[in-house]
Amino acid sequence: WRVLGDIEDFIAALALERGMSEKTCIGYGSDLRLFAAYLKRRKIENAADVKREDIVDFLANEREKGMKGSTRARRTAAIRMFFRYLKERHAIPTNPSDLMDAPKKALALPRVLSEAEVFAMLDEVKGEDPVSLRDRAMLEVMYGCGLRVSELCALKNDDIVADGELLRIFGKGSKERIVPIGGAAGRALSAYLGGSRESFARGNLAETHVFLTRTGRPFTRQGVFKIVRARAAAVGIAADRISPHVLRHCFASHMLSHGADIRAIQELLGHADIGTTQVYTHVDAARIGEIHRKHHPRA
């Protein structure tokens, strides 16, 4: 069946040619296979036979099933990119998604913890044993440098540069950026590297990756997630309020509230689009509004 084959080729191209993350490729692949199943039910076998109305009807049906606006936006983006890919390769005469309106996503404000909550979580990891030193370094680096969990897991010894003052990070699409290591993060990282990392090191991968599990393997996203939740639970932070990405949100939001320039935060986070970073201005406005409501006598 031609459409499904075209989709598999497109997903492979996303990873190989455009450097998109595995998570994005999986999401787009899932969206497009749903679309392909819909086309099959309508007896449409070739991408060249798809009309704008077919796409609109598919998205309308998904919306009627209760699909969130954010999911609809992603599916629309996947379909647009798929047909653009086919058109660029002259596999279809026209792009049926060209005249479609992009669905508007509701602004979803990032979840953030207060500074006091983050500090309590970091201060809770007090031990000098190897696991405590490692966990403290991981938490401090995530919060102090604003890393994505995938970037933390991929961090290698060679990525610690400038005598331990900077990290070289390879973000989405393998884009490189340089991030300063703050004082607290730097001290925690030095303590881990100098004191406990060698107790986890075994095997070839232990020679390259910074953060290692008890078996000497690099961390997975799920492994980091478990540590973050466990350390947060120890100071009473509910599981639904914390994740590695929440610490990244806290990094940006707390810097903004202390007067950091939005463009500088964009660079540190590795956002290609300033619009992605500007959501934190809404978070700060919401925080200021809450303070006003709590403390102004006539609020």
Give the label of every model feature segment:
Residues W1-A299:
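Conserved catalytic core of the tyrosine transesterase superfamily
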